[in-house]
Amino acid sequence: MLVTAYLAFVGLLASCLGLELSRCRAKPPGRACSNPSFLRSQLDFYQVYFLALAADWLQAPYLYKLYQHYYFLEGQIAILYVCGLASTVLFGLVASSLVDWLGRKNSCVLFSLTYSLCCLTKLSQDYFVLLVGRALGGLSTALLFSAFEAWYIHEHVERHDFPTEWIPATFARAAFWNHVLAVVAGVAAEAVASWIGLGPVAPFVAAIPLLALAGALALRNWGENYDRQRAFSRTCAGGLRCLLSDRRVLLLGTIQALFESVIFIFVFLWTPVLDPHGAPLGIVFSSFMAASLLGSSLYRIATSKRYHLQPMHLLSLAVLIVVFSLFMLTFSTSPGQESPVESFIAFLLIELACGLYFPSMSFLRRKVIPETEQAGVLNWFRVPLHLLACLGLLVLHDSDRKTGTRNMFSICSAVMVMALLAVVGLFTVVRHDAELRVPSPTEEPYAPEL
């Protein structure tokens, strides 16, 4: 398993580099890329945002392993994960309103403080302290995915008066480097935890200086901005009306809830499946992120002028890949007949599918959901998503260890079959909808500049 993980990592990394280099050579520079003021504003945003993302990714490979290192049972670990998910959904519902009221910069600084405290709780073996840490982690995650982007959009439009058409270029580049940071963070986590031998708590301690630096840079370089005009109840009510009045939105939300709840369960299960077979967790995690990056690169190529595939087709392909991978996992995790290499390949396919899924879903959401209702609709999407994930982990908590993992993959397979049916339903509804298609080869390319 050790050799397989390193070979997969090197192979995936080489594939990603090859695709990105060929794409960069073929793409001419855009007008936004040559604007010094725009590039400076991007740099001010990236230097804080990327530190926050790096600190977040650094903790991912060894979270389950740390709880296992503290001799907690799998059921107890499942409850810790459920606590984190419940915290994320509760704080996520009010995060946008909280950020608007508190201030975007202040919220980013609060993120660095709460996430640092979350990391410090990992030094304790007390179960209650770890539960508090998971709650802080949920708050931090909600702030990470709301405050930073809200701050940048306000600065981009209100302070610098840049064209709104340039905003996707900033976030497309951020998405690419987010994958790169995740790959590097996995290797760094493996280095401090395993190669140096500091143990599974080391990545969490190493994340604290990154969070402190992110908070300090935000305090020094960022201006504050507020938006006190949105009421939480009005936002949610508008989102619910949009969800119930448009069948496309309802089907899209169903697909997102089913697909992403399965991904949350996968995040919990990959460590106990591979760790007993000597897998280097940091390198395995980096391989996952490289596979996801490869999927994103394939998405950009597939939707380019040359191939002109539609996001709806790629969304369907992503769901099919995950269905196939989960069926693989139901066999490769059979008690007494475990095949870690097959499980690892299935996990890589799931991550590849994620690389196709997220940009496809982002494109379709942007086209289907009115901009003024997106925050409210996404709040309603998150509720079933996290509830399904929590229910899955609670079912696993009550299962026998030897058969529980296989049974959970079987349940996830059934969930993804339902997601596939929802995709077919969405296809039926939007098959003649030109709005959900990328521009034709004779028009400007859809993909934002990187």
Curated annotation (Swiss-Prot):
Transmembrane is among the record's keywords: yes
Pfam family, one: MFS_5
SUPFAM superfamilies: MFS general substrate transporter
Protein name: Molybdate-anion transporter
Main localization of the protein described in the UniProt heading: membrane
Keyword DNA-binding in annotation: no
Membrane topology qualifier: Multi-pass membrane protein
InterPro entries: MFS_trans_sf, MOT2/MFSD5
Keywords: Cell membrane, Ion transport, Membrane, Transmembrane, Transmembrane helix, Transport
Transmembrane segments: 1-21, 43-63, 79-99, 128-148, 174-194, 195-215, 249-269, 278-298, 311-331, 344-364, 376-396, 409-429
GO terms classed as biological process: monoatomic ion transport
One CC-aspect GO term: plasma membrane
Similarity-based family: Belongs to the major facilitator superfamily.
Subcellular location: Cell membrane
GO molecular function: molybdate ion transmembrane transporter activity
Function: Mediates high-affinity intracellular uptake of the rare oligo-element molybdenum.
